[in-house]
């Protein structure tokens, strides 16, 4: 069975949710502690959301120096699929595995809402279950989700197809070019601010209208992200 590591730092909140999403997708979730200098032979890694090390200095800055991250950086350079969600995205940027930075939301408020995203790049290890142009609805919760990069970096990201997810209908945090997630050149490392792990199990996902016209919890739009990496590993 495919084994997917889920990293826990002090202050991580969503590791159990990420592990549950991995298991629903059909893989075995393997806990990786921040002090681990060994990835225990996992086939992919998820860095989940939360407030690692209390968000001191900058969000993700201390986590980027943890022993487990040295191994993740090394193995990602050899092709290991890595997904960073919310705080995990911040950690990937602080580790220079992905470009840009996540800063305070432009309205200076913490967000918690369902968010529509458009898949811009369906050719990464984490998005192959989708088609470019597909829209998905997943929860969003952050205070520092405002993605920014230099004009030259933004032009490169757009020109080389490295924008993976884009906010639809509304830009919730001021991110440049409505960017919600990006990838590296190889397509094995992806980071996004919204939380696909919270939209993987029927009855517990975002609100949607049912056949009776009433609102129901049940969206599973995020499950394809976890199924994508399994397909990438076996394909």
Where are these regions (language model features)?
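Beta-strand-turn-beta hairpins that frame and shape the catalytic cleft
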Residues: 2, 133-135, 184-189
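Conserved Rossmann-fold NAD(P)-dependent oxidoreductase catalytic core, especially the SDR/UDP-sugar
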Residues: 88
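Pocket-forming structural segment of enzyme catalytic cores
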Residues: 97-180
